């Protein structure tokens, strides 16, 4: 703890990366990751996720700001810090002629493991990722799932404290994806992880914190629960009972209400989308009164949309709107 007074696994301050003096890939990102955290790194393509990971890994130097791992500043020369990390890139590639045994032995040598420690470590990892039956087979014939499991074993060979996995479920079939998620859950009991992903259901299942990047800026950093709490609950489905003519008449009346962006009826299911400036409580109260006046029974009502995904989309949409407004103001000033 003396070497790491903050106790944080990762700490960044005003982290910025500009390529070729013109492309701002990452802008003023400040965040911290505590031990035991499983951070879901989210953002659309081009948001800055890969740049952020490269800076954390020490593969690039920041233009401004800094990254600290375990209380020490990360840089391309900080080999001691990289030894405490395990990394999986998107779509990992391996030498086709090697086998799992020869490849993992090669990685272990790079980390300086002795012969006596390499053999039991390799055997344990190969069993753990279920590659024992093919441990002597060329990697060239491996499926995506087998390749991903080999990447997991390679990222664990140095017994790292921090795992950084970039799109670990990308390209996997449902069974392989499920195995990967279960593995992340098990590892999270003893390690800190950063999981970069486009699959929001995966993040929702295995992560307890989220960082959302948009156009190089950090637009959210906090718990997944708080992220869901930011969701606009403006999309509802109502199941109805009653005379079909009465339901149709009530729907027509609801369509005339100004609170709703869209109103659609499919048989006895009414779908409502509120305008952004509408108050949910009063709008739904008007709907309930209209249904009651038309002798239509409301059987059930539910908010639609996967919560993490909707909250993420809302954040990105708001940030894009702010970006447009800023650009418009600059244009007007000019």
Give names to the regions the model predicted:
Residues 20, 72-75, 218, 241-244, ...:
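Short, surface-exposed acidic/glycine-rich loop or hinge patches that mediate macromolecular interfaces
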Residues 180-275:
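ABC transporter nucleotide-binding domain
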